[in-house]
């Protein structure tokens, strides 16, 4: 029996989505544009990084080849490696959104074929009757924000008034989300989480995918900082995922980071919380040592998306990729015969793109392990094939929406 380690580099798209134009994202390419900026010097930042994008380990696993499959061109400053050591390719999403739950659920074998509900971008984002119900049932004196916004911007804009008034900061984006920011000291973390549970129930009628708690600390706009106590309150996946199938087969599903929240904790048998990419990697390595035969270890590396993609920070994103890449040998040294690692992403978030939202892109799929021989599988027409590849490797029955890429 084998083990599978499924690592999602949140938002690390590689461009080329065949339906990108329908999402307003024609030409978006997270990897390609980061590489282009770095090759031109626009990705330099004093004390952080400089020069072309350096991802030698992922390149050796087929990343550059996958990018060329997705877009027809090589990322600037990233030559083809002399040898590839993994099974590689690109995957297109069939789910109707470009959001986190849709991407992860499809990776786990369950595409999202329905349309999420969204809040309007102009005027008040939330209907008056919803706001009234939130204030009444959540026992708050009102809300601030009530608009589409960047999380860091809206905290800077309304944070002080929130601390004075006790009104939570409520906002949304182009994703199907209702986000609530509140100060951990003056409002209270537990109170924020309780409010999110109230709102989760109230927005079910609007078909909203997630309610997200965004706690922060600080005493003025200059030092307001979001903490690592974020929580996502998601709806359940529409069908059983590979997590459910593994749980039913008596296997252990290790959910690291926000994976548990994304799947509403369904099919998760062991939860490990960690904050920040390096802490998430360390936690994953610990579980690699502990996981038993037949286990799935599923980690989301959120910083790429949360800290750099949405904030349109090219040098930060590039440095985070390079730091992640440098840790891969630590993982490789811990693998046992029969183990398989899958590196992929759930959507794009091109830091050079207009706005602050996700971008519709293909994603890389890089697989390696002691028993895998190098080859390309080409372009998969659904993320669901990723989950089915893991299912076959772990020896459980196939699901209805994909096939193994091996």
Swiss-Prot record:
Can you quote a single GO CC term?
A: cytosol
Instruction: Kindly state which keywords UniProt assigns to this record, in alphabetical order.
Output: Cytoplasm, Isomerase, Manganese, Metal-binding
What's the protein name? Phosphopentomutase
Family label: Belongs to the phosphopentomutase family.
Gene Ontology molecular-function annotations: magnesium ion binding; manganese ion binding; phosphopentomutase activity
Q: What residues does Mn(2+) 1 bind to?
A: 10, 346-347
HAMAP family recorded: Phosphopentomut (MF_00740)
What this protein is reported to do is described as:
Isomerase that catalyzes the conversion of deoxy-ribose 1-phosphate (dRib-1-P) and ribose 1-phosphate (Rib-1-P) to deoxy-ribose 5-phosphate (dRib-5-P) and ribose 5-phosphate (Rib-5-P), respectively.
Q: In which pathway does it act?
A: Carbohydrate degradation; 2-deoxy-D-ribose 1-phosphate degradation; D-glyceraldehyde 3-phosphate and acetaldehyde from 2-deoxy-alpha-D-ribose 1-phosphate: step 1/2
Q: Which gene encodes it?
A: deoB
- Residues annotated for Mn(2+) 2 binding in this entry: 305, 310, 358
**Location, primary (coarse class):** cytoplasm
Q: Does the keyword Iron-sulfur apply?
A: no
What does this protein need as cofactor?
Mn(2+)
List the PANTHER family hit by this protein, alphabetically.
Answer: PHOSPHOPENTOMUTASE (PTHR21110:SF0)
- Which reaction is catalysed here? 2-deoxy-alpha-D-ribose 1-phosphate = 2-deoxy-D-ribose 5-phosphate; alpha-D-ribose 1-phosphate = D-ribose 5-phosphate
List locations, semicolon-separated.
Cytoplasm
E.C. number(s) listed in UniProt: 5.4.2.7
Isomerase among keywords: yes
GO BP annotations listed: 2-deoxyribose 1-phosphate catabolic process; 5-phosphoribose 1-diphosphate biosynthetic process; metabolic compound salvage; nucleotide metabolic process
| Record's cofactor remark | Binds 2 manganese ions.
